[in-house]
Amino acid sequence: MGLAIQLIVEGDFAPNAVQPLDFGKLMVVKGKSKNVAVSLLNLGSKLSSIDYTIALDGKAGAEQHLDFGKDFGVGGTHTVEIPFAADSKIGTSTVTLTVTKVNGVENANATKTATGTLYTVERELVKRSVVEEGTGTDCGYCPRGHVAMHNMHNLYGDQFIGIALHQRSSTDPMYNNSYYLGFRSFPQCMINRSNGFCDPYDEMPAVLKASLNEIALAEVTVAGTFADEDTKVNATASVESLVAGDYDIAFMLTADGLTGTTTSWKQHNYFCKGHSGNPYKSKSSMPEDIQFLWDKGSSYYETYDNV
């Protein structure tokens, strides 16, 4: 017995209707402009161009035209780049985008505006992100986390601030229980203490890339020297903020190149040939950057960084 369902939707349908969606924070250097990704919810039958105005703190500028060079067709949410100019003064402004026309005719949608916060600054700071990774020597899947952290350091340089938190077991010679982020499995990581946890190998690269596209409102420059007794580090920090606000500073001292000769320093490895926990059936089926683990054995001596 067959079953068929027919759905018929009736009603007035505006062919030229767009709702812009709020676009968050943007930073523009004084005297310049920047293209900003804005999402447009198309409620009409086609979408090939818009006319719009941009208002700063309620004062609208001249109407502008943007041709997309193609028709997006019926419905859908589409992301386009719209140029936003800096304010004439340094500081924070409320910016409002109003889509006045769609395909050359008046925008028929009831909601025509979207808002964001514009930071007009003297110069744009380099965005850096902190990646805190939960790991451990007795974690057989953690070698891929080490690889991911290494890859991101090579890709982004000092824009990537990696911290390897050995918290899985107190038998780990690098065990750190001075603060707890609540990792539910290992390896796992958190970026800028926001957006929850993610897998360092499968998910972290994309989340990190997105975080580095966010605006930086402050810059911290750090310098450190060993004290005479070599058991303490004297550190100084300089902070430059582009906008006024209340800020807290947290710091951590990390080390690279840690090694040991006892068995507790050995890194467990489930990606080796023949291990029952290895999700890969052959070396050639593994991603190229972790193929070396196939031949490492079930545990191996590692050099640990960012600890």
PLM feature spans:
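Proline/serine/threonine-rich low-complexity linkers at boundaries of modular beta-sandwich domains
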Residues: 5-19, 206-217
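Short, surface-exposed loop/turn segments at beta-strand-coil junctions that are enriched for proline
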Residues: 85-91
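Proline-enriched interdomain boundary motifs that mark the N-terminal boundary
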Residues: 13-24, 62-63, 128-130, 217-222
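Short, conserved sequence motifs used for protein processing/export or organelle targeting and
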Residues: 65-67, 158-307
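A short beta-turn/strand-edge loop motif at beta-sheet boundaries
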Residues: 29, 42-49, 240-247
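Short strand-edge motifs at loop-to-beta-strand transitions and within beta-strands
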Residues: 76-82, 288
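Local sequence-structure signature of Cys/Sec-based thiol-disulfide redox active-site neighborhoods
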Residues: 121-160
